[in-house]
A protein has these predicted regions:
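Long, contiguous binding/interaction regions
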Residues: 1-47, 53-191
Length: 191
């Protein structure tokens, strides 16, 4: 059965890692719904958050392949229920419509959004919430023909359990393994 899975990968912050990761999705013909890459709590380690709809069997195989990428330190997959997830969306509304319609003000209050910019041409409204809430607010603004532009972030996540200890242990294990088999670090290549 197809459902949404969120893959979280911690990698060394190196050129080409994003390409290698997304290439595996392409090979398995998995459409990426959301992709976010940011610095993790450990300096020099990036955190990839990739959301896609697929089967459990396919995501199992994909994660096994992701673990084989040399720069990947740790990778796991989760369902939405296992993580704290949020997205940020920006909605642009024409100022004239905003002034003439009490509907926009009601929608902003109802969806617990906030106005972050207002000028003579347009108003920008920000909403932080679940994907479902962001989509519902967008749908309501579109139905009222109020929305002129829309954008959203990728899924931002936090684990319900701490992952730093496990990540640090995996990083140390990887560095030790590379030292034991004689791999040079990227830093030593550059000297």
């Amino acid at each position: 059965m197809t459902k949404e899975y969120i893959v979280i990968a911690f990698t060394e912050n190196q050129i080409g890692v994003l390409n290698r990761i997304t290439a595996l999705y392409l090979r398995r013909k998995i459409n990426i719904e959301s992709l976010k890459v940011s610095e993790s709590s450990i300096r020099g380690i990036s955190m990839f958050v990739i959301s896609a709809f697929t089967t459990r069997e396919t995501i199992d195989k994909l994660v096994k392949q992701l673990r084989n990428i040399i720069d990947v330190i740790q990778v796991e997959y989760y369902s939405n229920e296992e993580l704290i997830t949020q997205e940020i969306a920006l909605y642009k509304i024409t100022s004239k419509i905003f002034r003439e319609s009490g509907t926009v003000d009601r929608i902003v209050r109802e969806w617990n959004a906030r106005i972050i910019e207002m000028n003579p041409q347009y108003v920008v409204v920000e909403k932080t919430g679940t994907r479902e809430d962001i989509d519902a607010m967008r749908s309501e603004l579109e139905q009222q023909q109020l929305l002129t532009e829309f954008t959203r972030s990728g899924t931002v996540v936090l684990h319900r359990d701490s992952v730093e200890d496990k990540l640090q242990a995996n990083l140390s294990r990887k560095q030790q393994r590379n030292t034991n088999i004689g791999f040079k670090t990227r830093e030593s290549w550059q000297k």
